[in-house]
Amino acid sequence: MALPEFSMRQLLEAGVHFGHQTQRWNPRMGPFIYGARNGIHIMDLTQTVPMLDQALQAIRDTVAKGGSILFVGTKRQAQQPIADAAEKCAQYYMNHRWLGGTLTNWQTVSQSINRLKAIDEQSERGFEGLTKKERLGMERDQGKLQASLGGIREMGGRPDLIFVIDVKKEALAVAEANKLGIPVVAVVDTNCAPDGIDYIIPGNDDASRAISLYCDLAARAALDGMSAQLGAAGVDLGAMEEAPVEEAVAAEAPAEEAQA
């Protein structure tokens, strides 16, 4: 595998260049704005392209060194793409609501994760020994904990990098990462400040197509990092029983060509 490729045309078709209304802009994003059209700021994609590439390289390198990525996006249109991307590359995500202290107070959060795991174990046994009322209470707690913590239940500790959609909405996540020195890759729209973002991706953080594109590219970069990590360890990713689908297919293709 290689770092995922993308074109300016793809970015244009996904609407990455569309910012917010000009009166809602943040002057700190001025250097990344090309101009305005019909009262809407237009992003300078000649800057977005190399900056997105640098961000993907950071994701790839983090995973290649054995690090973990936390995908963060809790706005409605980001929730599914964030979860899909993280699951695709065996990383972690938070897409329901950012819980204060997720990074800075991991010990407390891990206690909640342990409670979720304990309830899951009881659920597998049919909540035996509990009354109907107690079972309903457990199921309610299970649903809430799964929504909030399901994406990080196997993370085991703080991530090595976070990938964020909408830095204004996820300001708390960015602040916690900054406090701990965890690098931040983030899509930054024209109404946001790029402060505290290590790898800025100037772009539309509202359009579903744009969000899906960012998430897909980030997942593919992480998969490339995983491939590099396993390759360095002498592991044939395609031969692994639990290998991600993309790698398994890529590994089988040369064999099929050889038989042809």
Swiss-Prot record:
Signal peptide: none annotated. Keywords: Ribonucleoprotein, Ribosomal protein. GO terms for cellular component: cytosolic small ribosomal subunit. One of its GO terms (molecular function) is structural constituent of ribosome. InterPro entries: Ribosomal_uS2, Ribosomal_uS2_bac/mit/plastid, Ribosomal_uS2_CS, Ribosomal_uS2_flav_dom_sf. GO terms for biological process: translation. Pfam families: Ribosomal_S2 (PF00318). Belongs to the universal ribosomal protein uS2 family. This is Small ribosomal subunit protein uS2. It comes from Roseobacter denitrificans (strain ATCC 33942 / OCh 114) (Erythrobacter sp. (strain OCh 114)).
